């Protein structure tokens, strides 16, 4: 699975993700070092790591962790996926790369490492944040979204609806909130014959659909629209997961919604996301196992 920031370790306390006493308002970031998560890591030279972080104060930053591949004690398990930590960062004037001096784990969800699909969902969201949000443009809401997804995974395992909620929220933060209920071109309510055009911002009414001829345009049925509307109306991935069990929606609705959002994301990023390819392989393997 490409894009995964290292192999998660074992948690010191498996119950910690659900324990409110672990930290007081961990996302507030009122003092101390920046709070953040690892999006990905790349080996650098013999003993260093190039670490891409998303922090509450600096947004997405790239830092060099000297000696991180030889000494685990210095960074105390904070360079893994599914870990929220405080990172001590420094940078020379006019320097491009930050230096990561040390880190302290604040909260961890690494007990999820045994669930390959949960790790795949977490890796996908890390790649989404890395790809969609600009460097060094802090958006604390992005960190909240990542943590909320991890909480949803810990609460009940992988959830397609929770993942759709994260996609919608991150697209919104990136300035490309998908049109779901009204036409992205004219603003009118949707009716029969609507399509979803990723390049034009989402839903397109029948009257405007004649000019939607680009690759990726697809039918936008009422069931798909209602499914996305229901998810967008929820308060984040933890509550959105309830939509998975809603009998109003069919497997076709869920698949169409997923494909529509993925097409929009892929168009914005300009390349396929490697973590999505891995998720597709996991899905195919699961279907074969049921046959």
Language model features with spans:
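Non-catalytic alpha-helical scaffolds and adjoining flexible linkers that form interface surfaces
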Residues: 1-49, 54-291
């Amino acid at each position: 699975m490409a894009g995964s920031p290292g192999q998660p370790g074992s948690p010191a306390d498996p119950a910690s993700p659900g324990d409110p006493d672990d930290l007081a308002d961990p996302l507030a970031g009122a003092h101390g070092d920046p709070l953040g998560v690892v999006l990905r890591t790349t080996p650098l030279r013999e003993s260093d790591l190039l670490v891409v972080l998303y922090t509450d104060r600096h947004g997405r930053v790239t830092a060099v962790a000297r000696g991180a591949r030889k000494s685990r004690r210095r960074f105390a398990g904070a360079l893994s996926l599914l870990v929220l930590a405080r990172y001590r960062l420094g940078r020379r004037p006019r320097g491009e790369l930050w230096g990561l001096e040390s880190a302290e784990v604040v909260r961890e969800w690494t007990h999820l490492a045994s669930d390959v699909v949960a790790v795949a969902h977490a890796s996908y969201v890390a790649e989404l944040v890395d790809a969609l949000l600009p460097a060094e443009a802090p958006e604390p809401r992005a960190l909240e979204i990542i943590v909320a997804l991890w909480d949803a995974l810990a609460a009940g395992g992988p959830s397609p609806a929770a993942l759709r909620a994260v996609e919608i929220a991150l697209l919104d933060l990136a300035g490309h909130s998908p049109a779901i209920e009204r036409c992205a071109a004219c603003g009118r309510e949707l009716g029969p014959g609507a399509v979803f055009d990723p390049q034009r911002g989402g839903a397109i009414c029948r009257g405007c659909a004649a000019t939607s001829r680009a690759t990726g345009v697809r039918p936008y049925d009422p069931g798909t629209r209602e499914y996305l509307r229901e998810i967008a109306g929820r308060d984040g991935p933890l509550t959105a997961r309830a939509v998975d069990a809603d009998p109003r929606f069919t497997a076709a609705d869920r698949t169409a919604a997923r494909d529509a959002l993925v097409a929009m994301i892929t168009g914005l990023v300009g390349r396929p996301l490697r973590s999505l390819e891995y998720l597709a392989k996991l899905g195919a393997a699961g279907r074969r196992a049921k046959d």
